[in-house]
Amino acid sequence: MSTDTSTVLRLDCEEAIAEQIADLVAETFSSDEAAASTFELKPAERKEGLPGWRVEIFLTASVSEEAVRALVATIAGAEVATAATSTPIEQRDWVAAALEGLAPVRAGRFLVHGAHRRDAVRVNDLAIEIEAALAFGTGHHGSTRGCLLMFDRVTKARHPKQILDLGTGSGILAMAAARLLHRKVEACDIDKDSVLAARGNARHNGVARLVRPVVASGTSHPAIHAGAPYDLVFANILARPLRGLAPSVARVTQRGADIILSGLLARDVPGVLSAYRIQGMALRDRLDLEGWVTLHLRKQ
């Protein structure tokens, strides 16, 4: 999701309608304009007389609420579209917020820290120092730390040589791979601001020669095609884009490749696993952390 995201629309409806709305949003807008997620409300969250499913539609400034409400109305009716609540999303400097109240993040052999906590780095740590960059903080720690921990597990037995980081964000996973494996890592993100931040972080951590992020949607960039076939892929993004990426990931990976996926809630796991199983990728390991799920798959 782009850092230009400014609004989320929420509405409650039946499950089938929720899925139709999410699919229509995905078909109508590009992933850097709008994205939708659906989930079942917990019993305590449900209001009497209202359906038990919710749709959340995240909009960038380039998409008008009116256009999305009109889209919702074609499926759910004008009354439901009008009743959808609109909430502005605060843009945050994730690192600045982290520096205010969060300790360095330790994950296996890795330590992610701000400049103010260089004292936390131990002799054998693979330390990654992150400079400030715009990013959404929701779930960032759980999903990224989960990926680092899973990567730490995988690389105790295997030694990938061709690595891809899809949705690199601040570049933490790509830098971790470069630091540990001393290999070039292809990385991309749909958000140009994230790519600029990731490039800056790579320079700051001395791995700019190995990590050169590009702006790209999925695996579409020539640099990503040139680096294939990969034997390790990271994708720490939302469930719906993860499902959509399954065929592309299959095309750019070699047999026996390890795929580490995160950005998932527990309810998202069956759908994501199904999408990748169809492409010949089987579950090897799972890690649940701070409400987020990280999956390790292997291509058969």
Swiss-Prot record:
Which Pfam family is one of those matched by this entry? PrmA
**Localized where?**
Cytoplasm
* Annotated signal sequence range: none
Q: Which InterPro entries match?
A: Ribosomal_L11_MeTrfase_PrmA, Ribosomal_PrmA_MeTrfase, SAM-dependent_MTases_sf
Q: Catalytic activity annotated for this protein?
A: L-lysyl-[protein] + 3 S-adenosyl-L-methionine = N(6),N(6),N(6)-trimethyl-L-lysyl-[protein] + 3 S-adenosyl-L-homocysteine + 3 H(+)
Q: Which GO terms describe its biological process?
A: methylation
- Which keywords appear in this protein's UniProt record, sorted alphabetically? Cytoplasm, Methyltransferase, S-adenosyl-L-methionine, Transferase
- What does the record give as EC number? 2.1.1.-
GO CC entries: cytoplasm
For the ligand (S-adenosyl-L-methionine), the binding residues are T144, G167, D189, N236
Q: Which GO terms describe its molecular function?
A: protein-lysine N-methyltransferase activity
* Record-linked CDD domains: AdoMet_MTases
Q: Per the UniProt record, which residue ranges are transmembrane? A: none
Domain of life, source organism = Bacteria
Q: Where does the UniProt entry say this protein principally localizes?
A: cytoplasm
* HAMAP family with a match to the protein in the record: Methyltr_PrmA
Q: Which family does it belong to?
A: Belongs to the methyltransferase superfamily. PrmA family.
User: What function does this protein fulfil?
Assistant: Methylates ribosomal protein L11.
The protein depicted here goes by the name Ribosomal protein L11 methyltransferase
